[in-house]
């Protein structure tokens, strides 16, 4: 099964927030100043990069979406540099010029890969009339599919509630990367995207997954949010929505060099994907993949459609990820030629929890490749009842495919995967629970082919049914 990229070329997104210019001066140091005990830097390279809300807009434009940027600037060289640089990457700027204030600029002096000093040129925009910002939002609402509010607490978003109200009245989702601990100002937003530190600063330290979910759901209720996405660095990200099961997506980063601007990439991809007509769950999947790409780059970076496509399709195209039966047979044949031991397991995996993750990791350790066969929606309904599955097949497979322990994910329509197993004939068939080996579907076929069958224990205290019951109980309070 292939995962298609969103139609970014049809997506329109407006970003409103704190715009700033990042300046970098590089050069060698070879002596100490006679005027003071400080190094003398002979500047030989100057770089200018859009920062803050401008970096979010660049991330949206880099995907091929229509990005509009609104913010407050001075009338100065920094504002002109921002406009020029952003125009070159197809970001449409509609700045509100404030003659009494400088454009927010952060100047960094670096030598030998060390930052020696940072100079900030800024005055708070808190007292500036927000009406011109409201007018620009109103003018764009008919042609955008999402509004991003990028808050760096520099004064552009003193009237957040008015902005949220304007967008919601027009049916446009509002995504906010929050700043500080006053989430009351974001009341009524469609989606907040705090990182774990920001989340815990408001909700309190979370000692377990259940506690994070419980406190996140309380924030959603307290501030009338439609959803909350907590980004958790190497632990991936967790999406929470009222009356829905938590969706946890493991990180896809292979190497982490720099997390600078990763939050801008996440909210930019989320907004562009939603504006293209995709679901929030799909938007989180693409944002998670993009974050895995951008943290592998040095400095503030963006993600191109090709890079995103490689991130979400690369595993399948090179023999990994979500597959059709035919693709799986070819991948298994190639693995056997390389002398690799193929392990196979199956299940519904409706709400992925710690027990599932631990079980799959243990199964993967038993061989070189792990296949996970997943019950289709119809098969799950017959097995678990009319209220299941909670998460549709495609989403269940996408999340499983993102796990480091899982190599291949395939679906089956029957009540058991016996036919599928007979066609694959893994070297080791694994099942979790209280089964006897001879009771496991496909065991006879695997034994007849000289393979092994094994039962692994599930982690105690983890149950999809219990999670669903807890969510239902909480929603009834």
Curated annotation (Swiss-Prot):
Could you tell me which cysteines form disulfide bridges? none
Question: Domain of life here?
Answer: Bacteria
Instruction: Return the SUPFAM superfamilies for the record.
Output: Nucleotidylyl transferase, Ribokinase-like
What are the recorded GO MF terms, alphabetically? ATP binding; heptose 7-phosphate kinase activity; heptose-1-phosphate adenylyltransferase activity; phosphotransferase activity, alcohol group as acceptor
Its Gene Ontology cellular component terms are: cytosol
Tell me one GO biological process term: ADP-L-glycero-beta-D-manno-heptose biosynthetic process
The record's active-site residues are: 264
Gene3D superfamilies per the record? 3.40.1190.20, HUPs
Task: Report the catalytic activity.
Answer: D-glycero-beta-D-manno-heptose 7-phosphate + ATP = D-glycero-beta-D-manno-heptose 1,7-bisphosphate + ADP + H(+); D-glycero-beta-D-manno-heptose 1-phosphate + ATP + H(+) = ADP-D-glycero-beta-D-manno-heptose + diphosphate
E.C. number = 2.7.1.167, 2.7.7.70
The positions annotated for binding ATP are: 195-198
Q: Which InterPro entries match?
A: Bifunc_HldE, Carboh/pur_kinase_PfkB_CS, Cyt_trans-like, PfkB_dom, RfaE_dom_I, RfaE_dom_II, Ribokinase-like, Rossmann-like_a/b/a_fold
- Kindly report, in one word, the top-level EC class recorded for this enzyme: transferase
Sorted alphabetically, which keywords does the UniProt record give?
ATP-binding, Carbohydrate metabolism, Kinase, Lipopolysaccharide biosynthesis, Multifunctional enzyme, Nucleotide-binding, Nucleotidyltransferase, Transferase
> Which segments carry the region annotation Cytidylyltransferase?
344-477
Q: In which pathway does it act?
A: Nucleotide-sugar biosynthesis; ADP-L-glycero-beta-D-manno-heptose biosynthesis; ADP-L-glycero-beta-D-manno-heptose from D-glycero-beta-D-manno-heptose 7-phosphate: step 1/4; Nucleotide-sugar biosynthesis; ADP-L-glycero-beta-D-manno-heptose biosynthesis; ADP-L-glycero-beta-D-manno-heptose from D-glycero-beta-D-manno-heptose 7-phosphate: step 3/4; Bacterial outer membrane biogenesis; LPS core biosynthesis
Q: Where is this region: Ribokinase?
A: 1-318
**What is known about what this protein does?**
Catalyzes the ADP transfer from ATP to D-glycero-beta-D-manno-heptose 1-phosphate, yielding ADP-D-glycero-beta-D-manno-heptose.
The UniProt similarity line reads: In the N-terminal section; belongs to the carbohydrate kinase PfkB family. In the C-terminal section; belongs to the cytidylyltransferase family.
Q: Which NCBIfam families match?
A: cyt_tran_rel, PRK11316.1, rfaE_dom_I, rfaE_dom_II
Q: How does it assemble?
A: Homodimer.
What's the protein called, per UniProt?
Bifunctional protein HldE
Q: Which organism is it from?
A: Salmonella typhimurium (strain LT2 / SGSC1412 / ATCC 700720)
């Amino acid at each position: 099964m292939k995962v298609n990229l969103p139609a970014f070329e049809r997506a329109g997104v407006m970003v409103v927030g704190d715009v700033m210019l990042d300046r970098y001066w590089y050069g060698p140091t070879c002596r100490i100043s006679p005027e003071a005990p400080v190094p003398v830097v002979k500047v030989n390279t100057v770089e200018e990069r859009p920062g803050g809300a401008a970096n979010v807009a660049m991330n949206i434009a880099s995907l091929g979406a229509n990005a509009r940027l609104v913010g407050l600037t001075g009338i100065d060289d920094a504002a002109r540099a921002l406009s020029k640089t952003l125009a070159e990457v197809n970001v449409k700027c509609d700045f509100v010029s404030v003659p009494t204030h400088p454009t927010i600029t952060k100047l960094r002096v670096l030598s030998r890969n060390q930052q020696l000093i940072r100079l900030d040129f800024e005055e708070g925009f808190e007292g500036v009339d927000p009406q011109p910002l409201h007018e620009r939002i109103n003018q764009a609402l008919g042609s955008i599919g999402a509004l991003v509010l990028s808050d760096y607490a520099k004064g552009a978003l003193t009237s957040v509630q008015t902005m949220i109200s304007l967008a919601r009245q027009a049916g446009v989702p509002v995504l906010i990367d929050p700043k500080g601990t006053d989430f009351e100002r974001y009341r009524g937003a469609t989606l907040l995207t705090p990182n774990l530190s920001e989340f815990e600063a408001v909700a309190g330290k979370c000692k377990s997954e259940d506690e994070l979910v419980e406190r996140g759901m309380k924030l959603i209720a307290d501030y009338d949010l439609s959803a909350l996405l907590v980004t958790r660095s190497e632990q991936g990200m967790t999406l929470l929505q009222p009356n829905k099961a938590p969706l946890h997506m493991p990180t896809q980063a292979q190497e982490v060099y720099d997390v600078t601007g990763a939050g801008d990439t996440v909210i930019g991809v989320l907004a562009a994907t939603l504006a293209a007509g995709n679901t929030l769950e799909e938007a989180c999947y693409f944002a998670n993949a993009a974050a895995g790409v951008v943290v592998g780059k040095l400095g503030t970076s963006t993600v191109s459609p090709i890079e995103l496509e490689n991130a979400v399709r690369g595993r399948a195209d090179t023999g990994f990820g979500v597959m059709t039966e035919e693709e799986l047979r070819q991948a298994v044949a190639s693995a056997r030629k390389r002398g690799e031991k193929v392990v196979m397991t199956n299940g519904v995996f409706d709400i992925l929890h710690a027990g599932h993750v631990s079980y799959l990791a243990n199964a993967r350790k038993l061989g070189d490749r792990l296949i996970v066969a997943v019950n289709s929606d119809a098969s799950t309904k017959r097995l678990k009842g009319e209220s299941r599955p909670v998460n549709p097949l495609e989403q269940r497979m996408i999340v499983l495919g993102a796990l480091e322990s899982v190599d291949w994910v395939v679906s089956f329509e029957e009540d058991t995967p016996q036919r599928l197993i007979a066609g694959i004939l893994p070297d080791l068939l694994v099942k979790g629970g209280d089964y006897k080996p001879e009771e496991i579907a496909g065991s006879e076929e695997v034994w007849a082919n000289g393979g092994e069958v094994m039962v692994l224990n599930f982690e105690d205290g983890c149950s999809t049914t219990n999670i669903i019951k807890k969510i239902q109980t909480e929603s009834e309070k």
